[in-house]
């Protein structure tokens, strides 16, 4: 490595807000299944605190050694609906509390996996888990929840969509932060290191390390050097920058897996913003020539960014996965917040951008009087984009306050302006229930 590359890396960290967003340890809880829910909770606590005992210490050690901030250390676990189904319990809050207790004991920031996979219907534990979500997220601090309601192979479970509209409302009514820790997916992935949607898939190894990186500030600085040049140059610049970012992510992941004695899983090729100035995906899109994100051309700019990040990342690391798409969470990106406030970015444009990125309606505040059926219809729209286009899409939406208010979440979750929602009713549409069938092009066998 020549001196120029060394100084570039130092600048990425000191001036351009580059960091490793998360080291996430995935832990299988299948061997914790027990017909007694309290025994299951104890087994869960013991396994997590044993397997992840050194996760935070190792993360801090690597950060100090390399001089690269590692912002979050997290744990993801087997979807709890699978564990709870073996019991006769009528709610799974006790399992959520076991997760929370374990997370606090080992010192991680979040623990994900209070989850259910219901894309084609409910099994015994699924409905119980879904109805437990409001209390589980209210009575815990670090637990995150996700529900997969659709897939390209299965279609969209509209009964579950309707239920999740209600659950999001109930969660927001019980807790200021609860809905910010709840994601509804289509085509959810099993190796996602990012919260709130992380869970440990049943096809994964017993314990695994996945890494998520963050580098929109680095990409923006690189694009500042090629202002006015063609999109060919822009694409090449993004690709080369993504290569460097991913290389560092791979190094951190491999070091962590070696020191913890577990398998290295994947690097998630996602650009994850923060509320800090200089760490915004929106500002990257504007650097390509948009006056403000949300104007015409935004979706095309996002497409270029997303694709070139993947091309550069795949060259840098063999093992890539997770969501691997630019994140556009409104409350967590100062450029997105500004665009909503100046009127150029609305829910409809964010829905269009979902066709490109992984989580379209992410960390969005909407009026608290929005009907549950309208929230469900938003979920259905996002799921349809994912199911038809064979990609992951998701909704993380917070019904709080009135249009124009600012909702403060703090920390990495930032501040969300309450956005306008279409007032026309979707009640009759959502009340049908049942299943939207899988698209014809899903029939591959």
Curated annotation (Swiss-Prot):
InterPro entries: UPF0210. Coiled coil: none annotated. SUPFAM superfamilies: PFL-like glycyl radical enzymes. It comes from the Bacteria. Pfam families: DUF711. Belongs to the UPF0210 family. Homodimer. This is UPF0210 protein SP70585_0294.
